[in-house]
Amino acid sequence: HAVIGYRDNDIAGVLENTVFLELLRRGFSVNIGKQDVAEVDFVANRADDRLYIQVCYILTPENTDREFAPLEAISDNYEKLVLSTDTLLRVNRGGIRQKNIIDFLLEH
């Protein structure tokens, strides 16, 4: 977003940047994951630890499959998260957890 500039209506992009910077602060190397046509927002690696993260503004019935599907396609046992601004929603789908982005940022 530093290259294309900031747009007020790009909340999802701002959230992604925030998560990216937090992962770097925690000592992870961060990449984007791609498997076939599915893309994972972040693949974070640190020593023997790996974390897969999807970031979205709000989980809705319309976008839940889109956010979880790329993580479901990964067959290893590393932690997989969908981060959103939802505060009451707590989805656990096949071991993939939805977590509030603020709660994630306040960890560690």
Predicted regions and their residues:
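A cross-kingdom feature that marks ATP-driven nucleic-acid transaction machinery
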Residues: 1-108
